UniProtKB/Swiss-Prot annotation:
Transmembrane segments: none
Glycoprotein keyword on record: no
Full protein name: DNA endonuclease I-CeuI
Lineage of producing organism: Eukaryota, Viridiplantae, Chlorophyta, core chlorophytes, Chlorophyceae
Coiled-coil boundaries: none
UniProt-listed Enzyme Commission number(s): 3.1.-.-
Length: 218
């Protein structure tokens, strides 16, 4: 369990925020994931976790309700077609429940826990490395999570997996596959259509942008 508990409405102390950032900066440089886990346990006073079949089933139930498989797209001038499509797994939790985020790190052996910007004490675990998503996250979902999921969420997992396979086949380097295969999956999976923080308002806008970018029309 975690012995670090905040009261309702209480903010995560600044020293904890700074230490968390320092820990994340360190693992980015060293790639020492074992030390990263140790540092997180120390920071949030988390007891060591044993990964068992039962804990995996517990995590599966939690992820089914709380986690997200997302695909975002944004303009990037240095990319081949002027935009990038980014798949990501994430799950948020109040710091009082940090142990379940830590359990996910132990199970997946990858990921980062950061403070959610603008929140009092919400943490977010993200995994955005495509190889890790394909080799660690998706197999876990297929083995443990989809059995408890709605048809809509099962389809979402399938779409996410299909996107990763397209990336593996370098479809993002081919204009026609980007436009006709990758971007339609992104469009299907968007949860926040019409939000101002999206790179493109709809599928057609993203497709037209990619086509015209290659022609020098931005």
């Amino acid at each position: 369990m975690s012995n670090f508990i905040l009261k309702p409405g209480e903010k995560l102390p600044q020293d904890k925020l700074e230490e968390l950032k320092k820990i994340n900066d360190a693992v980015k440089k060293t790639k020492n994931f074992s030390k990263y886990l140790i540092d997180l346990r120390k920071l949030f006073q988390i007891d060591e976790v044993q990964v068992t079949s039962e804990s995996k089933l517990f995590l599966a139930g939690f992820l089914e309700g709380e986690a997200s498989l997302n695909i975002s797209t944004k303009k990037l001038a240095t990319s081949k077609f002027g935009l990038v499509v980014d798949p990501e797994f994430n799950v948020t939790q109040h710091v009082n429940g940090v142990k379940v985020l830590y359990l996910a790190l132990e199970v997946f052996k990858t990921g980062r826990i950061r403070h959610k910007s603008g929140s009092n004490a919400t943490l977010v675990l993200t995994i955005d490395n495509r190889q890790s998503l394909e080799e660690k996250v998706i197999p876990f979902y297929e083995q443990y999570v989809v059995a408890f999921s709605s048809p809509e969420k099962v389809k979402r997992v399938a779409n996410f997996k299909a996107l990763l396979e397209l990336f593996n086949n370098d479809a993002h380097q081919d204009l026609e596959q980007l436009v006709n295969k990758i971007l339609p999956i992104w469009d299907q999976m968007r949860k926040q259509q019409g939000q101002s923080n999206e790179g493109f308002p709809n599928l057609e806008a993203a497709q037209d942008f990619a086509r015209n970018y290659k022609k020098g029309i931005k």
